[in-house]
From Swiss-Prot:
Function summary: Member of the two-component regulatory system HptS/HptR that regulates genes involved in hexose phosphate transport system in response to changes in extracellular phosphate sources. Activates uhpT expression to facilitate glucose-6-phosphate/G6P utilization by directly binding to its promoter. Antagonizes CcpA-dependent transcription of a subset of CcpA-regulated genes involved in antibiotic susceptibility.
Species the sequence originates in: Staphylococcus aureus (strain bovine RF122 / ET3-1)
Molecular function per GO: DNA-binding transcription factor activity; sequence-specific DNA binding
Keyword tRNA processing: no
Main location as per UniProt: cytoplasm
UniProt-recorded name of the protein: Transcriptional regulatory protein HptR
Domain Response regulatory residue range list: 3-118
GO CC, alphabetical: cytoplasm
Keywords, ordered alphabetically: Cytoplasm, DNA-binding, Phosphoprotein, Transcription, Transcription regulation, Two-component regulatory system
Chain positions found as 4-aspartylphosphate: D55
SUPFAM superfamilies: CheY-like, Homeodomain-like
One GO BP annotation of this record: phosphorelay signal transduction system
HTH araC/xylS-type domain location: 153-250
Lineage of source species: Bacteria, Bacillati, Bacillota, Bacilli, Bacillales
Length: 252
């Protein structure tokens, strides 16, 4: 649904952020990378991303110059820097930067920022009456990065690791030293929905990343863990109030 441009002259950093962060969990299905501000500016002008993550000190065009070039655009910016430099940070703040992170990047901290950002973006879509706004309510329970219960966090992690398989509740909690009834009750108390409901919502969320990649819908159903296409279609309509084919038409 959303797009991000990651700009850093260190390949290991930009590729690391691209691969490690679970972008699909935050509705980002298109991730572009650039090694300097010149490449980033071209990508931003061409694709109009909702988020730009950029280093400050880079060859050819640094982060502050890039910010000057995109100041007129409606995109959010996160600044990365190895330098705890107040003047550079102040320059970024003047350009309405979303946040400022020092390297090495704390991935958990970045995910907290992404969680806040996607809530704002989805709220804006809803207020603007955009056709994909139903995603806001359907996937709201998935946006929280961490819960204050160890067992709940373990179950969520297991769901994200095994949603593509025909996993059951028993499978999800087999490595957790609690009863199935306790796990189900605790999960519902903290998350507000059942484990099975969370699993199915997460599967549908992941399916959105595949709908524009020329897969057959029955192939997508299998890739996200549904044993039958009709179950995929049922849950898709349940959470998004439209069929997969209608979603594809409206997303174009």
């Amino acid at each position: 649904m959303f797009k991000v441009v990651i700009c850093d002259d260190e390949r290991i950093i930009r590729e690391g952020l691209k691969q490690i962060i679970p972008w699909g969990d935050y509705h980002f299905n298109t991730i572009y990378t650039a090694k300097d501000g010149v490449e980033a500016l071209s990508l931003i002008q061409q694709h109009q991303p909702e988020l730009v993550i950029t280093d400050i000190r880079m060859p050819r065009k640094n982060g502050v110059d890039l910010l000057n070039d995109i100041a007129h655009l409606d995109c959010n910016v996160i600044i990365l820097s190895s330098y705890d430099d107040f003047e550079y940070m102040k320059a970024g703040i003047q350009h309405h930067v979303l946040d400022y992170l020092l390297k090495p990047v704390d991935h958990a901290q970045l995910e907290v920022i992404l969680g806040r950002l996607v809530r704002t973006l989805l709220e804006q879509q809803s207020q603007n009456g955009r056709s994909l706004a139903p995603c806001h309510d359907a996937f709201q329970p998935l946006l929280k990065v961490e819960y204050d219960d160890y067992y709940v966090n373990q179950i969520v992690d297991q769901i994200k690791q095994s949603y593509q398989t025909k996993v059951t509740v028993s499978d999800l909690i087999q490595h957790i030293d609690v009863s199935e009834s306790y796990a189900m009750r605790t999960f519902k108390d903290h998350v507000g929905i059942t484990i099975v409901d969370y699993l199915n919502r997460y599967r549908i969320l992941q399916s959105l990343q595949l709908l524009d990649r020329h897969y057959k819908h029955y192939e997508i159903a299998d890739k996200v863990g549904f044993s039958e296409y009709k179950m995929f279609s049922y849950h898709f309509k349940k959470y998004l109030q439209m069929a997969p084919s209608d979603y594809c038409k409206q997303a174009k």
